[in-house]
Amino acid sequence: MKYWDFRESGKPQYDYYAYTDGSYLVPKNFGAAACIVLDRDAERVLYQWSEASRYSTSHRQELAAIIHALLHVPERSSVLVRSDCESGIALLTGQVRSKKDGDLVDLYRQVKKDRELNVTLEWVRSHSGDRWNDYVDYLCIEALDLFESKGTRVREGVDSEALFAYICKQ
């Protein structure tokens, strides 16, 4: 199995690494977002979350996962966020604009500023054998399955209120 390793790629080391993913099932009108936060060696999962919700889009799920990850790294730290959503990264870095997702872009910027985070966004090809990207993809699928079969929104009761409390504060 191939997976990304900063020691082999010559990438700078960060305080934390995060992987995020989002998905959406159009016919069923619900989607899921997931993230994991890893230690500075990108080997141990420090935090993981996944949640299913209705009435969204795949793109919004991807952006929500990135924001959620940022809410779960310590303030004033550096974090490399790896996502398989090129358009989401382009949106958050200001390469493209979107009226539809502007609220989440604003929220991303506010979280980054308020928490004094040094964030680097990096694209990873989906389904390419990267173990952590594959894992967050699995968490999304699991969240969708739990939501469809049992109506369970949050994986194993992991607290997801941080994102929604932050949004309500605005």
Predicted regions and their residues:
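RNase H-like nuclease fold core
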Residues: 2-60, 64, 70-73, 166-169
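RNase H catalytic domain
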Residues: 20-30, 66-139, 144-152, 156, ...
